[in-house]
UniProtKB/Swiss-Prot annotation:
Keywords: DNA-binding, Transcription, Transcription regulation. The gene is gfcR. One of its GO terms (molecular function) is DNA binding. InterPro entries: GfcR-like, PRibTrfase_dom, PRTase-like. This is Transcriptional regulator GfcR. It comes from the Archaea. Belongs to the purine/pyrimidine phosphoribosyltransferase family. GfcR subfamily. Contains an N-terminal DNA-binding winged helix-turn-helix domain and a C-terminal regulatory domain (or effector binding domain) resembling phosphoribosyltransferase (PRT) domain. One of its GO terms (biological process) is regulation of gene expression.
C-alpha cells in the first residue's frame, strides 16, 4: 500500500467513526482540502500539501524531550516570563502540558472553532474553564503543527478577548512559513518551505 493509499484508508476509517472533515484534517495533520480529497477522491491529483508523520515522537519519553526543547526555544526567543501555556486542542494538548511543566507555569486548553457544530461556529473557539485563567497573564500558545495559522490566530483573539496577552506561539512543524501570526512570534522547531 502506498502512503497515499494508507492516508485514504485512515481518512475513510475516521469518517466511519463520525469525524468531520476538519477533525480528520487535524488527526492526519493535513489541510482541510487534502482531507476532503482523501475522503472523496474527487479529481486525479491531491491538493498540494505536505503530510507530516510525527507518531514516533508521541511516546511520552520522546514527547518530554520535544517539550524540553520547545520550552528552551521559548525562553531563548521570548524576553517576557510566560505565565500560562495555552495548548490547542487536540494534538497540542499533551505537548503544551509538558511545556508548561518545563516552564514552571500554568496551563490551559483552547478549543478551536473547527471543533464546533455549524450553529456554534459563529461564536468562535473557547478557552477551557477547567484550567488556568489567562486574564492579566502573558501566554505562550503551543500546537503540534500549523498549516494555515487559523487556530493560532483564533487563540490569540480569544486570549486577548479574555484580557490575556499572547506573547508567542510555538509549534513542532510550521507548514505555512512566516515567523509571526497576528504580530506575535511564531517559533518553529521545523519549518517546511516549498521551493
Amino acid at each position: 500500500m502506498t502512503k497515499i493509499e494508507t492516508l485514504v484508508e485512515r481518512a475513510r476509517r475516521l469518517k466511519e467513526k463520525g469525524l468531520t472533515t476538519e477533525e480528520i484534517a487535524d488527526e492526519l495533520n493535513v489541510s482541510r482540502e487534502t482531507a476532503l480529497w482523501l475522503i472523496t477522491r474527487v479529481g486525479e491529483t491531491p491538493p498540494s500539501d505536505i503530510y507530516v508523520e510525527w507518531r514516533e515522537l508521541t511516546k511520552p519519553s520522546r514527547l518530554r524531550l520535544v517539550a524540553m526543547a520547545m520550552a528552551d526555544m521559548i525562553v531563548s526567543e521570548v524576553k517576557e516570563d510566560i505565565e500560562v501555556v495555552v495548548g490547542i486542542a487536540t494534538s497540542g494538548i499533551p505537548l503544551a502540558a509538558m511545556v508548561a511543566e518545563e516552564l514552571g507555569c500554568e496551563f490551559t486548553i483552547y478549543y478551536p472553532r473547527k471543533f464546533k457544530t455549524d450553529e456554534e461556529k459563529p461564536k468562535g473557539g473557547i478557552l477551557s474553564e477547567n484550567f488556568a485563567r489567562v486574564s492579566g497573564k502573558k501566554c505562550a500558545i503551543v500546537d503540534d503543527i500549523t498549516s494555515t495559522g487559523r487556530s493560532i490566530k483564533e487563540a490569540i483573539e480569544v486570549i486577548e478577548a479574555n484580557d490575556g496577552k499572547a506573547v508567542c506561539a510555538a509549534v513542532i512543524v510550521n507548514k505555512r512559513g512566516g515567523n509571526e501570526i497576528e504580530g506575535i512570534p511564531l517559533l518553529s522547531m521545523l519549518k517546511i518551505l516549498r521551493i
